[in-house]
Structures are given as structure tokens and as C-alpha cells.
Amino acid sequence: MLTAGVENVNRDFRLFTGRANPGLGKEIGSILGVELGKIAIATFPDSEIHVQIEESIRGADIYIVQPTCEPVNDNLMELLIVMDALKRASARQITAVIPYFGYARQDHKSTGREPISAKLVANLLVSAGADRIISVDLHATQIQGFFDIPFDHLTALATLASYLKEKHVENGVIVSPDVGRAKFAEKYADLLELPMALMHKRRAGVGGTDVEVKAEIIGDVRGRTPIIIDDLIASGSIYKHADSLVAEGANPAYISITHPVLTDDSTQRLNRPSIQEIVTTNTIPVPAEKQIDGKVSVLSIAPLLAEAILRIHKHKSVSKVFLDQQVIFPV
């Protein structure tokens, strides 16, 4: 891993942050040993966003940290305007560091006459000036293919798995919430040397509608401590999985997710006996009111992002990040 200090980067390097997660940007800067670039961002009374770059960046290699989390549209628009300002100020290259990629769940048309919003966002980012994208644990990995510029797809898997390994979860079992996350769960299971189980949703059509019948548990969970994994937690519906597992004789569950989207009503759903801890990262800020009585443990993704940024800036392989963590993941 990298060693902090100003010697890691040169004078052509600049790190900026938007207002979506300034704490993460500052932490990345601290690890790299650089101060954040000088930028003024304001919102006018009519909700328009104004940006002023307050230092010369001509010919510089720019990294702008801005997850497009809630409020998604405001933070996305702010990122686009910042990149436009950077481009017009003659930045040599602009890398958008988007730890959480909003609209990633709208990656395809589920029914007719729907947009593919993730593709639209990709087009907007490139049009605004992005030359490269860095993101973490996309909800749909195929979004990388929406871009014709380099896209570095990182994963928080090792960060989360290391924490769970130190917890010494007794008689643990990795649980995938659905078939789509099975491969991701398998990587967790390999890292933690634990068995794996799968929640399989069986559906049946009634009167022309698609109605969920039940979630079957494939695998042995009785007497074990489940670790339910996913890329994000939003509405809090994952609590149903925890309840189902406990009903089958499992211990209260850990939930391990990268992105704590946590909508307003989700915290009430997640504060229940079937869930003992939610382990997540700071790709999105988690305010105190969403800490769910201390059940939420937030790990820092800054070291991973700092390592990737430094390697890109120095034209080194980003895949080395994953080799160091003994993780095989598409980048």
C-alpha cells in the first residue's frame, strides 16, 4: 500500500471535492499528503449552483471526489458543473471519483417506454469533461460499458471482509440476498473461509401480476450467524431476509454492504432483534440520525481510493490494488 506524503504526487496533481462527501475527500487528501484544491461552490436562492475554481489548474491532472448520493440530482448536477469549470480552466485531464454511482439501478429497460438513466448519466459525465471514472461496487457492473473512456471499478470487499474477520464471527455463514449476488457472496466466503447460503425468491403470477410467494433459503443456516452481503441498502427491505433466517434457526445477522443509501424510513425497519450489526463504508455520509442506535459501523474507503488515484496518476496498474488485497474482481 502507499505511504502518505507529498512526495507521492507532483505539482501537476490536484484533488478537489464537491459538497456531497467533503469528509471523504479530505481523508483522501490526508493520505496522499496534499491539500484540497481551492473551490467555491454556492447555491443561489433559486437553487441554481455556482462554481468558482480559485486557483490556477492549467495543465493539471485533476481528481474530483463527488458521490452522486442523496440528493442525487443536486449532487450530480454539481459534479457536472464543477467538471465544466475545470475543463474551461484548462485542466489537462479530469478524473471523476464517484464512490457511489447514482442511477446505477436504472441500467436497463424493465418495461416499454422507459429510459436507461444510467446511460444518460454516463453521457452527461463525458460531455461535462470527464476523461476517466473511478467508482466502487456498482450496482450493475455492465455500466462500465456505457462509457468510452477508462473506467476503474473498485471494490470494498476486502475492506469489509477484513473487519468481519477481526470480529471472529462465531459459526458464520455468508448469505447472498438473491441469485444475482451469488458470485459476489462467493468471494466473501472465500476470503473469510466460511460456507455460503442463498436466498432464492420464488414468484408466481396471479391475475397477470408478478407476486412474490416466499424467499427460500438454500444452504444450512440453523445455529449459524448469517452475514448478509449486498452492494447497497436503501429502503431497508433486507430486514426480511434477516427475519427469515432467524425464523429458520439462525442467530441475529450481520449485514455487510458498501453503500449506506439508507432512506429516511429504512432505519426503523433495520432496528430489530434479527439484525445485530450493519457494516458499511463512507462512500456516502451516514449522519448521526441514521446510526440506528449504534448498530451501524462505518469503515473508511479512503485508503482504497487514495491508492487507486495515486496509481492512476503515476501510470501504474490499478489491478495491483486488488492483488495486494488478494481479491479478484473485474476492474
Residue positions per predicted region:
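PRPP-associated nucleotide enzymes
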Residues: 1-331
